[in-house]
Amino acid sequence: MLQTIYNETKDLMQKSIQALNREFSTLRSAKVSVNILDHIKVDYYGTPTALNQVGSVMSLDATTLQISPWEKNLLKEIERAIQEANIGVNPNNDGETIKLFFPPMTTEQRKLIAKDAKAMGEKAKVAVRNIRQDANNKVKKLEKDKEISEDESKKAQEQVQKITDEAIKKIDESVKNKEDAILKV
């Protein structure tokens, strides 16, 4: 039963790290990523639909993205959705595709985005600590119900702490890597 708690704890913490990395993909670094458009929804016949579901999004170079809609009549809707998303660029509609030209980031912008990355990392650490607390509560309940001894409980809590320390270390590494990518000119 303790092994089950350890496995659940590792799994949940790993999911928190994966969620952090997905969140990082929406941040702009030196090269513009197509993921920066992931949160944009287009009005597709009255239904809010993810941009990547109504057309292909590709990176032309480090500062340019191109959107090729499956249906040409969606160009205006895509253009409006991008403007409403307020991502800092104006869409350039050529009648066939929409191009987004991102200006090079200033040092100030880089620092702000790096600060956002750090805040995301802190949120992930809080999630990991909450998972640790839940695991420790399960261990204490087993001890209280006399299913494990006090010594086993202490060892189990130490093991949960080791798992937590590993997860926090991975989060710190992810944050450092993302900050380096953002601040790199």
UniProtKB/Swiss-Prot annotation:
Cite the residue spans of the region called Disordered. Answer: 138-159
Kindly state which keywords UniProt assigns to this record, in alphabetical order: Cytoplasm, Protein biosynthesis
Q: Which GO terms describe its biological process?
A: cytoplasmic translational termination
* Compartments it resides in: Cytoplasm
What does the entry list under GO cellular component? Answer: cytosol
Origin: domain of life: Bacteria
Q: In Gene Ontology terms, what is one molecular function of this protein? A: ribosomal large subunit binding
Q: Which InterPro entries match?
A: Ribosome_recyc_fac, Ribosome_recyc_fac_dom, RRF_sf
Broad class of the protein's primary localization: cytoplasm
Q: What does the similarity note say? A: Belongs to the RRF family.
Q: Which HAMAP family match?
A: RRF
General function of this protein: Responsible for the release of ribosomes from messenger RNA at the termination of protein biosynthesis. May increase the efficiency of translation by recycling ribosomes from one round of translation to another.
Its recorded name reads: Ribosome-recycling factor
| Organism per entry | Helicobacter acinonychis (strain Sheeba)
